[in-house]
Amino acid sequence: MGDETEIGFAGAPDRPGHPGGGPGEQSPLQARAQFLKNRSWELVTSLNQGACATGGAQHGFNRETQETCASEWAEKQTQSLSLEETIEFLRRCHRGAPFLFFNGNTFADVGRQLAGALFADLPTGRRREVMSAIAHYIAGVLDRESMVEIVESLCEAAEFILRGEVELPPAARASK
């Protein structure tokens, strides 16, 4: 369609400027997709089983919340959501505690995987920091404002470097 915007770096419209959400710019957290489409509830359950095995805890379900969370998950799998909406949903799942143990680790792991795929174009160190910020927010150890600031600033800085607007030190230029 002629009126559709091309999708570019980290899901932001492909146009000059950074994806960090400045005036007239789209935040990378506004990228929309069916982020949970290929992540079944069975996968989430297996991630929790792995976290419990690693942590030496018994895997099991919270009878009061597991069914509701699983049905909400199935519903969200079919929806196109922004990354921010998806992250908020993962945080709600963590707080809903559908498993006996390691809910934070489980849903943070899903968020980390999504961020790793979506921000694959970022330099490795920045991508890891974005993944960490998103995971820590989902797990409840980082506030929303800080997470948004970290994600947007790392994407903005990376975009400036990728476009050559930042003079790299000689050692960094040599390694490129």
Positions of the model-derived regions?
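FIC/Doc superfamily catalytic core
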Residues: 2-176
